[in-house]
């Protein structure tokens, strides 16, 4: 509305898919997997986020008093939360945790589990119960712990429900693995995103 009134005095940039006619904006900056097409569309490879490499480096030592002080290298699991597409049922969490535990045991890695704002409290407690005292589960949302876990990790695993957290993990340049959950309905948009990252290696 303001754009229509002020005409050229307002330069209008929208971040992500506006879900309305693209011609209402001077520019739209949106992830490539949103499949927006137009002369005023600027596409990004991943989801747009605010993390910087400096932030990650500056917080590297934050978790050193939390994690187990041994020779094992660290794998970090970043957990999202339930969405319209993915369910965080005990069955789905058990499948992820069991697959991950086998890898940890085989390669003798230490796991650090980081929850997000969307992670159900029962999923956090289940992770603590499942992995026990030999690994580290951060029990509450803690941005510094998140940044530190990204910095310390040899490998990063992110649940499939969050394009943003996958994009943030990619900032580290480290190997990223996706913890898959069977979708409740067609998740082709998320699949496009993951396929794009796979092609980028």
Where are these regions (language model features)?
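Leloir-type glycosyltransferase catalytic cores
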Residues: 194-201
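Catalytic donor nucleotide-activated moiety binding site of glycosyltransferases and closely related
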Residues: 108-143
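Short, charged/polar "capping" segments at the starts of alpha-helices
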Residues: 21-22, 37, 85-86, 119-125, ...
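A donor-sugar binding/catalytic signature common to diverse glycosyltransferases
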Residues: 146-187
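Short beta-strand elements of ligand-binding domains
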Residues: 12-16, 31, 179-180
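Glycosyltransferases and closely related glycan-assembly transferases
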Residues: 1-13
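A nucleotide-sugar donor-handling region in carbohydrate enzymes
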Residues: 22-89
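Conserved catalytic-core segment of nucleotide-activated headgroup transferases in glycan assembly
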Residues: 73, 82-114
